[in-house]
């Protein structure tokens, strides 16, 4: 199998590999689906509030003061529907009465941030990832999506639960 193929796969593929004991741990944005045949356990490690950032030329005092309504007037970059966060954001948009102008959808959150840093739009990121956003010049905080959180789940097979490195990763991630 090519390295590129191994780096891009669906959650279902990862869970299959986990069930076959080819992997010991999967960190995902959602819990494993209930399936007694897979014999997997999920544990929510973290939930982090979602904030919005954008380039300085798009995010001024007026946009911050009008947030979240300002999302109706700004170009918006979002994760694709494959992301666990996207349905939550779509529900939040609806609850807030927002109709954002979506100008791009990305599978890769780092690429999404690069496009924003180049001035192409505003984007959501969990507070966990906000420190990395700060490394990109010219991005400013627009606002916070009240009630929207991004989750990280540790998904393990029963055999993988006792792997020393898995135990160490999970313990380090707990609050």
Spans of model-derived segments:
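Ligand-binding cleft/hinge of the Venus flytrap
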Residues: 1, 70, 86-99
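Central regulatory/effector-binding core of bacterial HTH transcription factors
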Residues: 1-35, 106
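Short secondary-structure boundary segments
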Residues: 30-31, 56, 126-129, 145, ...
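Short beta-strand->loop
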Residues: 40-51, 127, 135-149
């Amino acid at each position: 199998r090519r390295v590129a193929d191994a780096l891009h796969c669906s959650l279902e593929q990862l869970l299959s590999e986990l069930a076959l004991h080819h992997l010991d741990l999967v960190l995902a944005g959602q819990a494993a689906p209930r399936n007694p045949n897979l014999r997997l356990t999920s544990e929510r490690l973290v939930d982090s509030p979602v904030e919005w950032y954008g380039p300085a030329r798009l995010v001024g005092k007026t946009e911050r003061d009008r947030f979240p309504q300002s999302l109706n007037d700004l170009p918006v970059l979002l994760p694709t529907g494959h992301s666990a966060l996207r349905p939550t954001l779509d529900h939040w948009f609806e609850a807030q009465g927002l109709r954002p102008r979506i100008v791009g959808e990305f599978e890769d959150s780092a690429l999404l941030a690069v496009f924003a840093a180049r001035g192409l739009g505003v984007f959501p990121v969990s507070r966990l990832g906000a420190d990395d956003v700060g490394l990109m010049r010219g991005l400013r905080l627009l606002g916070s999506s009240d009630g929207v959180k991004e989750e990280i789940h540790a998904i393990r097979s029963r055999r993988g639960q006792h792997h020393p490195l898995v135990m160490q990763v999970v313990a380090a991630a707990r609050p």
